[in-house]
Amino acid sequence: MALLCYNRGCGQRFDPEANADDACTYHPGVPVFHDALKGWSCCKRRTTDFSDFLSIVGCTKGRHNSEKPPEPVKPEVKTTEKKELSELKPKFQEHIIQAPKPVEAIKRPSPDEPMTNLELKISASLKQALDKLKLSSGNEEDKKEEDSDEIKIGTSCKNGGCSKTYQGLQSLEEVCVYHSGVPIFHEGMKYWSCCRRKTSDFNTFLAQEGCTRGKHVWTKKDAGKKVVPCRHDWHQTGGEVTISVYAKNSLPELSQVEANSTLLNVHIVFEGEKEFHQNVKLWGVIDVKRSYVTMTATKIEITMRKAEPMQWASLELPTTKKQEKQKDIAD
């Protein structure tokens, strides 16, 4: 019976009776994600593309390992003994002071309001970077056309979650089992957006079998534009909320950010063939006419003017339990 190898970067099935000392090619280190770059601590190679990261060939040879790594130990939460209500009451005389009535908040507009494209401000650094890329791509265009149809032996499939490599013409007839969604890392959990099997262990995440069947994608030309995750964060001042998306060399003519008072839809094309999508149901209300987007060579900043000067508890409006159930049913 074939067993699954849990060595990092392998994920292959093997026969335990034919497990030689050099049968497995794997990474002894750990995955490193820093400033949008992804790689392994044991290797020097870094990439911004998650599929390229998954296809980085291991740097060490050894025996296959069928032992599943233990789940990270969760901290034990200790609770104190319950105290009587009388013990929790303050020992001094209470004086209740009635606070003044708060200023009436702005009524939340309907999310069905028409969407408006936010103004795009393009920095000089981005213009210079795009001009350089156009010159270099023009010089290499002929060479790319010659090499585009050639698939080298050992080329990894570009579909997410597929660890197969090209071994010849027979590989063109194989069925590819892959993940059609994008990888999501949130609050220590790792999963694919298409099947939502969550795990806290990165090795287990890499070994998750795909949920979709189709054909292998051996070249980026066949893959077309690929939806990829981007590192992003947000901050706020008294009157503005700013979202920063760390995508290099974004293309203004193909990118779009649209919004209404409570919704934000982000679509960014960057580095020629990568796409980033994000739909945000905003916690507060914004003034669309006074909001704009600044595009630089290294990131995109979405500046939204608050409709009222108040502190937002978070960027996104929390979903209700009813909405979560409806979303799970839809998935």
Swiss-Prot record:
<feature type="domain" description="CHORD 1">
    <location>
        <begin position="5"/>
        <end position="64"/>
    </location>
</feature>
<feature type="binding site">
    <location>
        <position position="42"/>
    </location>
    <ligand>
        <name>Zn(2+) 2</name>
    </ligand>
</feature>
<keyword id="KW-0677">Repeat</keyword>
<feature type="binding site">
    <location>
        <position position="216"/>
    </location>
    <ligand>
        <name>Zn(2+) 3</name>
    </ligand>
</feature>
<dbReference type="Pfam" id="PF04969">
    <property type="entry name" value="CS"/>
</dbReference>
<dbReference type="GO" id="GO:1900034">
    <property type="term" value="P:regulation of cellular response to heat"/>
</dbReference>
<feature type="modified residue" description="N-acetylalanine">
    <location>
        <position position="2"/>
    </location>
</feature>
<feature type="binding site">
    <location>
        <position position="176"/>
    </location>
    <ligand>
        <name>Zn(2+) 3</name>
    </ligand>
</feature>
<feature type="region of interest" description="Disordered">
    <location>
        <begin position="62"/>
        <end position="82"/>
    </location>
</feature>
<feature type="binding site">
    <location>
        <position position="195"/>
    </location>
    <ligand>
        <name>Zn(2+) 4</name>
    </ligand>
</feature>
<feature type="binding site">
    <location>
        <position position="27"/>
    </location>
    <ligand>
        <name>Zn(2+) 2</name>
    </ligand>
</feature>
<feature type="region of interest" description="Interaction with HSP90AA1 and HSP90AB1">
    <location>
        <begin position="65"/>
        <end position="316"/>
    </location>
</feature>
<feature type="compositionally biased region" description="Basic and acidic residues">
    <location>
        <begin position="64"/>
        <end position="82"/>
    </location>
</feature>
<comment type="function">
    <text>Regulates centrosome duplication, probably by inhibiting the kinase activity of ROCK2. Proposed to act as co-chaperone for HSP90. May play a role in the regulation of NOD1 via a HSP90 chaperone complex. In vitro, has intrinsic chaperone activity. This function may be achieved by inhibiting association of ROCK2 with NPM1. Plays a role in ensuring the localization of the tyrosine kinase receptor EGFR to the plasma membrane, and thus ensures the subsequent regulation of EGFR activity and EGF-induced actin cytoskeleton remodeling. Involved in stress response. Prevents tumorigenesis.</text>
</comment>
<feature type="domain" description="CS">
    <location>
        <begin position="227"/>
        <end position="316"/>
    </location>
</feature>
<dbReference type="GO" id="GO:0010824">
    <property type="term" value="P:regulation of centrosome duplication"/>
</dbReference>
<feature type="modified residue" description="Phosphoserine">
    <location>
        <position position="51"/>
    </location>
</feature>
<keyword id="KW-0007">Acetylation</keyword>
<feature type="modified residue" description="Phosphothreonine">
    <location>
        <position position="47"/>
    </location>
</feature>
<feature type="binding site">
    <location>
        <position position="59"/>
    </location>
    <ligand>
        <name>Zn(2+) 2</name>
    </ligand>
</feature>
<feature type="domain" description="CHORD 2">
    <location>
        <begin position="157"/>
        <end position="216"/>
    </location>
</feature>
<feature type="binding site">
    <location>
        <position position="5"/>
    </location>
    <ligand>
        <name>Zn(2+) 1</name>
    </ligand>
</feature>
<dbReference type="InterPro" id="IPR007052">
    <property type="entry name" value="CS_dom"/>
</dbReference>
<dbReference type="GO" id="GO:0051298">
    <property type="term" value="P:centrosome duplication"/>
</dbReference>
<feature type="binding site">
    <location>
        <position position="194"/>
    </location>
    <ligand>
        <name>Zn(2+) 4</name>
    </ligand>
</feature>
<keyword id="KW-0143">Chaperone</keyword>
<comment type="subunit">
    <text>Interacts with HSP90AA1, HSP90AB1, PPP5C, ROCK1 and ROCK2.</text>
</comment>
<dbReference type="GO" id="GO:0043531">
    <property type="term" value="F:ADP binding"/>
</dbReference>
<keyword id="KW-0479">Metal-binding</keyword>
<feature type="binding site">
    <location>
        <position position="157"/>
    </location>
    <ligand>
        <name>Zn(2+) 3</name>
    </ligand>
</feature>
<protein>
    <recommendedName>
        <fullName>Cysteine and histidine-rich domain-containing protein 1</fullName>
    </recommendedName>
</protein>
<feature type="binding site">
    <location>
        <position position="162"/>
    </location>
    <ligand>
        <name>Zn(2+) 3</name>
    </ligand>
</feature>
<keyword id="KW-0597">Phosphoprotein</keyword>
<dbReference type="GO" id="GO:0061077">
    <property type="term" value="P:chaperone-mediated protein folding"/>
</dbReference>
<feature type="binding site">
    <location>
        <position position="10"/>
    </location>
    <ligand>
        <name>Zn(2+) 1</name>
    </ligand>
</feature>
<feature type="binding site">
    <location>
        <position position="24"/>
    </location>
    <ligand>
        <name>Zn(2+) 1</name>
    </ligand>
</feature>
<keyword id="KW-0346">Stress response</keyword>
<dbReference type="GO" id="GO:0005524">
    <property type="term" value="F:ATP binding"/>
</dbReference>
<dbReference type="InterPro" id="IPR007051">
    <property type="entry name" value="CHORD_dom"/>
</dbReference>
<dbReference type="InterPro" id="IPR039790">
    <property type="entry name" value="CHRD1"/>
</dbReference>
<dbReference type="GO" id="GO:0051879">
    <property type="term" value="F:Hsp90 protein binding"/>
</dbReference>
<feature type="binding site">
    <location>
        <position position="64"/>
    </location>
    <ligand>
        <name>Zn(2+) 1</name>
    </ligand>
</feature>
